[in-house]
């Protein structure tokens, strides 16, 4: 048989000492951890693209925008407000029929992606809108006077100038999405949230709950640190 590397063995020994109940379910824990990041990765990528699109759309179609269209702005604005006002746990239940129709299942990782996207996109859209709205209008007007079209203004002015702030709001959204994935676990999506409930709280294994909390805190700390580092780099030296 293939011998496992010493870091893995050392980690498992440490877990056995500080969290014996978790050690007994270690395989399930690692599977749940992987499921959480699968949900985070897939839903996050979709939400990033869709949220960025709608955030840009709101900025360019608002009153005084480069492509003012109040009808489009109001429709998108209302839809975003409606979905932002729905608590995520209610949104999960509300979207069950749509999730089944689209992906064929409302449970498991596959069934969690769509609700996570619906729960994240409105929040991220607003964050992007605020970030882009902070771009100096003088630079926008200067680019327009030089003949830049709508796409040129979007990519060369709005998105380029707002890179540091976009990184910050993306970091905030990513951290929020981690929280949503744990909530999704409460209704059968799997992941760390489901593991903490089923193997921790329901079986009165507090050490399992404690380790899950610590793991999530570490993940959040890493995301925040990376986001801060990238934002500082783009602000001070320019990543692009």
Residue positions per predicted region:
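Short helix-to-coil transition segments within interhelical loops
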Residues: 132-162, 202
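Transmembrane alpha-helices
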Residues: 150-181
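Loop-to-helix entry region at the N-terminal start of transmembrane alpha-helices
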Residues: 31, 35-39, 84, 88-123, ...
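Periplasmic/extracellular loop-to-transmembrane helix junction in inner-membrane transport proteins
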Residues: 7-43, 69-74
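Non-cytoplasmic
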Residues: 169-218
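C-terminal transmembrane helix and the adjacent membrane-cytosol boundary/short C-terminal tail
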Residues: 57-63, 209-240
């Amino acid at each position: 048989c293939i011998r496992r590397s010493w870091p893995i063995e050392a980690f498992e020994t440490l877990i056995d000492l500080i969290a014996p109940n978790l050690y007994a379910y270690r395989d399930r824990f690692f599977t749940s951890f992987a499921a959480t990041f699968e949900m985070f990765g897939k839903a996050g990528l979709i939400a990033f693209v869709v949220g960025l699109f709608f955030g840009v759309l709101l900025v360019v179609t608002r009153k005084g925008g480069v492509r003012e269209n109040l009808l489009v702005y109001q429709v998108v604005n209302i839809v975003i407000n409606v979905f932002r006002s729905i608590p995520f746990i209610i949104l999960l239940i509300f979207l069950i029929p749509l999730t089944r129709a689209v992906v064929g299942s409302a449970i498991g990782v596959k069934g969690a992606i769509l609700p996570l996207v619906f729960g994240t996109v409105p929040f991220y859209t607003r964050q992007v809108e605020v970030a882009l709205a902070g771009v100096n209008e003088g630079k926008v007007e200067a680019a327009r006077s030089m003949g830049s079209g709508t796409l040129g203004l979007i990519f060369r002015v709005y998105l380029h100038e707002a890179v540091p702030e976009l990184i910050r709001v993306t970091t905030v959204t990513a951290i929020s999405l981690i929280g949503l994935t744990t909530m999704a676990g409460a209704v059968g999506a799997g992941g760390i949230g489901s593991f903490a409930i089923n193997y921790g709280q329901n079986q009165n294994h507090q050490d399992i709950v404690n380790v899950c909390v610590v793991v999530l805190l570490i993940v959040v700390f890493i995301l925040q640190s990376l986001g801060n580092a990238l934002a500082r780099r783009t602000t001070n030296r320019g990543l692009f």
